[in-house]
């Protein structure tokens, strides 16, 4: 009997279930968006119960499209938006509030207070991360401080913290109920600011600094676990017992999906944000140029692989904003044709610092800026500048990564929804001055989670099996001369500096 691997890909704007075959090809998929809740400036939330309902719906839709039953599915992998934080009650399964999304900046006060006590990099040696609103630790602390009765429940082990992977695994394994499993993997745990990168365990010093009870935290497991996290339920959305044995944060999953298994290999994912990861092997490399040190993956009981990461908060989210808030376009795909109407940006730059700036600046007080406007500017320039924002932010991350690793980028592997935009990919090649390559399966995030689950059960034997599945769909070579490339990049950098200190009352 032919078997398949199913993946739940829980992202920032949508949830989908995808079914893969042994060749790494998509057999079926179903996707649904969920609401972006913005109760006040700087706050971004998701409803965990809505996401669970969407998850059940996409599982049913995908399995039905593939014409499969539970017995046809060998294993399940999970991949998720990282850092997004929720806390729920162990007995009732009810969240204490909406999930606080990774883009949310309400924890700025927490981060500033802790930075004042020991500097923004006070935990970097252990966590590889700067103190920033991006990560889960400050979000948990904020919830504990603001939700009545939560701290008491957390100390008794009745309140459970999780990123979306933990929440979905808990629900899929029967939560609330005695069989429910409360776990996460090393990649997601490495984004909390609470895990020690060397021990791969929760760190008591970090927990004490954030005043977070250990009893509320999930157990940390490998990204590909031959011992399985647990099994889906007969009465659950899959309709049978299937092992859940792969779990990675979305960007680490994409790195696995792009088969970046050797030190020095890198990929860039274009989704809600932009995220570039470079595999540094089994050795940690700490950044001096604003990048993050993170766990890349851990397969079974092997040593973990680490990565340098450059995180950009806003990429595809800018296109979504143009569609939903500004009504500049009707669909996200319209941005490409609109941008094609002009040969360049007309001197206009758009720095989308909606949630501050992430790598390499880490400036939470920065805010979005459009500069260089004249009466010559039209909707086409606006669209092109929006695409260029993703390309220029990626260039900044590449520069930092090359400085930290002393490795020059020869080619950029890309994936994610925005890579369907051929114009953006050409702009990216032009901005970087190196070729850009899109694989046959551009949805590398879900594929990476499938690989992790499949390796755990022997569906694929090893990384060599996975590398054979990778192939080029399309590539773009850089055009234009270096003088113009340097000039335009300098203008972008100048625009970025104008966003600094916007929320600084003393400025």
From Swiss-Prot:
Regulation: Inhibited by fructose 1,6-bisphosphate (FBP).
Enzyme type, top EC level: transferase
InterPro entries, alphabetized: ATPase_NBD (IPR043129), Carb_kinase_FGGY (IPR000577), Carb_kinase_FGGY_CS (IPR018483), FGGY_C (IPR018485), FGGY_N (IPR018484), Glycerol_kin (IPR005999)
Binding, ADP: 12, 16, 272, 316, 417, 421
Binding, ATP: 12-14, 272, 316, 320, 417
Catalytic activity: glycerol + ATP = sn-glycerol 3-phosphate + ADP + H(+)
Cellular compartments per GO CC: cytosol
Molecular function in Gene Ontology: ATP binding; glycerol kinase activity
GO biological process: glycerol catabolic process; glycerol metabolic process; glycerol-3-phosphate metabolic process
Binding site for sn-glycerol 3-phosphate: 12, 82-83, 134, 250
Enzyme Commission number, as recorded: 2.7.1.30
Keywords for this protein: ATP-binding, Glycerol metabolism, Kinase, Nucleotide-binding, Transferase
Domain of life: Bacteria
Pfam families, alphabetized: FGGY_C (PF02782), FGGY_N (PF00370)
Stretches of the chain forming a coiled coil according to its record: none
Pathway of action: Polyol metabolism; glycerol degradation via glycerol kinase pathway; sn-glycerol 3-phosphate from glycerol: step 1/1
Binding site for glycerol: 82-83, 134, 250-251
NCBIfam families assigned: glycerol_kin (TIGR01311), PRK00047.1 (NF000756)
Family affiliation: Belongs to the FGGY kinase family.
PANTHER family tied to this protein: GLYCEROL KINASE, SUGAR KINASE
Purpose: Key enzyme in the regulation of glycerol uptake and metabolism. Catalyzes the phosphorylation of glycerol to yield sn-glycerol 3-phosphate.
Name of the featured protein: Glycerol kinase
